[in-house]
């Protein structure tokens, strides 16, 4: 049986340490390290495995700013003025955006409204990991949203999500929420520091390599901070 690789991860900044220590060497906080199992010692990370699966595109090519054709990257306007302004006048293809807020603040409803509208012209996928498809459909009906073209998926396995995304090739994806997603490559529970970090990295790489815009819904703690490692915010 393969030996499990373990590490101590700071709950505040997400920095890995080879052994436990009272103070995080990166952010300086005390008593924030938690032990996690990362899977077999020779197992690749989810992000590394993603690139091995043959997703088109590369993140390692070198170019100059003058060689980048901005005409091929038009922003996608949502029609919601304040939201577009926050994003710099629209959604950028290939971007990964984290939407955080208190429970009931309207994160899921806002993104559902945006995807229903944009799905009339652009292929869009809404992935729900917390609510059932019926619950999402009821909310859309209550808001009288156009749902005839929006793709829906109830799934929390990040590998299955990206496999289906490759099959249907949506240009917009909502992940609701990142805290309930998990990767089969990581031997820890959904919502743990390692799971959130790896799933986010996996999806960001997918967004960059396929030019797909992805929105993550993120929960917040009682203190008003985003739940999970600090690296999720960056």
Predicted regions located by residue number:
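Short metal-coordination and nucleic-acid-contact micro-motifs, chiefly zinc-binding Cys/His arrays
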Residues: 4-6, 20-23
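Short cysteine-rich clusters marking metal-coordination/redox-active sites
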Residues: 10-13, 24-27
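Short Cys/His-rich micro-motifs in 6-15 aa windows
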Residues: 28-38
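Catalytic, metal-anchored helix/loop core of enzyme active sites in primary metabolism
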Residues: 44, 161, 195-199, 205-215
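The Walker A/P-loop phosphate-binding site
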Residues: 51-143, 162
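Flexible beta-alpha connector loops of hexameric P-loop NTPases
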Residues: 72-73, 148-155, 183-197, 224
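Nucleotide-state-sensitive switch-loop elements of NTP-binding domains
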Residues: 116-186
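Phosphate-binding/switch region of NTP-binding enzymes
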Residues: 204-234
């Amino acid at each position: 049986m393969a030996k499990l690789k373990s590490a101590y991860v700071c709950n505040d900044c997400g920095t890995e340490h080879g052994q436990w220590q009272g103070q995080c060497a990166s952010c300086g906080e005390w008593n924030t390290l938690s032990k996690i199992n990362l899977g077999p010692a020779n197992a690749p990370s989810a992000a590394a495995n993603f690139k091995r699966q043959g997703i088109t595109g590369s993140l390692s090519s070198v170019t100059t700013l003058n060689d980048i054709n901005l005409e091929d990257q038009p922003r996608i306007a949502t029609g919601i003025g304040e939201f577009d302004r926050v994003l710099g006048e629209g959604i950028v293809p290939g971007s990964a955006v984290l939407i955080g807020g208190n429970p009931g603040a309207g994160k899921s409803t806002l993104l559902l409204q945006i995807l229903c509208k944009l799905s009339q012209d652009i292929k869009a996928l809404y992935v729900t990991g917390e609510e059932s498809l019926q619950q999402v459909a009821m909310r859309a009906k209550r808001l009288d949203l156009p749902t005839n073209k929006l793709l829906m998926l109830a799934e929390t396995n990040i590998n299955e999500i990206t496999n289906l995304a490759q099959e249907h090739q949506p240009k917009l994806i909502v992940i609701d929420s990142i805290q309930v997603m998990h990767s089969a490559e990581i031997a820890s529970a959904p919502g743990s520091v390692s799971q959130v970090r790896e799933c986010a990295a996996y999806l960001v790489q997918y967004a960059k390599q396929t030019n797909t815009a992805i929105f993550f819904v993120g929960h917040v703690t009682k203190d008003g901070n985003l739940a999970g490692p600090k690296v999720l915010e960056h």
